[in-house]
Each structure stands twice: as C-alpha cells, then as structure tokens.
Amino acid sequence: IDAICTHHEPLSSSAKMAPFAETQPGITAFDTYVALGVQLIQESLFEPLEWVEKVTSIPAQVANMTERWKQEAGWVLVDPELEWVVSKETILSQGKNTPLLGQTLKGKAVQTFI
C-alpha cells in the first residue's frame, strides 16, 4: 500500500434514502478515518510514522501537490486511547451512512491546528 486517502464528499441522508441502485455512492469515512488508522497501527500492519506518511505526504506526492501541502499543512492531535461509539450524534460529517454505526472505535482526532 503506497498511499491511503478518502474521497470526502458529504452527502445528505436524503441522497442515500432511495433504492440502492438510485442512490449516490459512498459512505461516511471522514469521522472514522483516524480510528481505523489507529486500529491498523495496533494490529502492527503499520508503524505510526509510516501510517502518517501514507495519509499525508505520499498522497500529496501522488496528486502532485507537495509544495501546496508543505505550505498549507496543519497538525492534528490524536488521542489513540480514546474510545467512542460511532453514532449519528458522534459523526460530524453531513452524511451519516456507515457500516460502523453502533461500533466502539479506539482513537480520535481531538484537535486540529492550521
């Protein structure tokens, strides 16, 4: 795996409330992205720094956005021990559709600095 990214395109609930073939594709991933990364690290599939590179600098290289990424990069403070339940209330994204609803995840971005 060279790079890991999401295609964050928030969809309202109404965009998903039709027969499957008629809905817009996609699931909510923005809110669970860090927790799933923490899980990959805890399962020893990635070292922490390796995962950070795969979700930050390497996607910027692939998209030919390295200079912009360096200029506009911020910091994210992650609590890898924070346990939380995925629910419509804890998902901040407009879209609330995820197969992870009701599951307890470990790890969450708790602060961003730009």
Positions of predicted regions on the chain:
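C-terminal cap of metal-dependent C-N hydrolases
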Residues: 19, 73-114
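His/Asp/Glu-enriched, well-ordered alpha-helical/loop segment
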Residues: 3, 9-80
